[in-house]
Amino acid sequence: MRLLVLGIVLSLLLSTKAAAEESPAVAPMPLYRDPVYDGAADPSLIWNPRTERWWMFYTNRRANVPDLPGVSWVHGTPIGIAESADGGTTWEYVGKAEIESPDPSIEEPTYWAPEVLRGDDGRWHMFLTVVPGVFTDWNHPRQIVHYESDDLRKWSNPRPLKLANDKVIDATLFKLPDGTWRMFYNNERDGKSIYFADSPDLDEWTDRGRAEGVGNRCEGPKVFRWRDKYWMVVDQWRGLGVFRSEDTEHWEAQPDNLLQRPGQGEDDQVQGQHADVVVSGDRAYLFYFTHPGRRGEAAQRDGAEQRRSSIQVVELQIQDGWLKCDRDEATQVELAPPAE
């Protein structure tokens, strides 16, 4: 009888251990911090079939560089790359993107908000915000530039896009059912409104004006399709605004924002900002960044602690027809390679 009981206990322990090993690990908080400048922001994720790893491209703000006046620390920024070998749970720095300047006369261009995708031609395409130099204020032109790559590391053939004006940022692209590419972006000269443009081939673009129903005073749009709806997530500096649509032309605003209330986790006790969304199977994951040092009495200071930023992740849910998430709930990330 004693042997039988021991056998049952051992069997239960082994089955519990096996189940634990099969379950995906919980993503750490923070998910990722950049080891060079400690300024990872504006994440954009893509599956790299050559390395069989998920890659994360991000704006690498120069948060830890001392004595940079004004907002010059947000300029002169490279595009960092991190990779994950375990489906998006943990990330390691693998360097920076090698980007050809659209204007060789610019000594130190600024790169922001990469949007990376695979085109119909099988090549990699990046739509990148480029600022012509390093500045201490926000009062300078910027443009969205189209790049191409064969390996996701070296980016060349820069072609600035002709959009609404000379101060546009933060492209996000989505392929419509008829094969048309639709790009949403932030028009800063029109009250930081969201505009959109269409292209049959990623090269020739027709600007379509404002996105109906989105309003203004936001940036960093991300558009994706999930559970029979089109969704747009934008950074409103009070968490993430959400909009839904049946056709990507007419948008309806969600009553409340995501990630407006601070979380409890490490580096997550502030609002969430500029996000990417990866849909994997029936699940969707929101990758966002935070400024952990901007809270309490220290929030108004301008030191390295207030400038640094971290990447976080949370799984999205749908409740009463709208997006919801619980940033304090453990997130098990399971990003599968996309279907070919």
PLM regions: where:
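Carbohydrate-active catalytic/glycan-binding domains of CAZyme proteins
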Residues: A20-E340
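Bacterial N-terminal signal peptides
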Residues: V5-S15
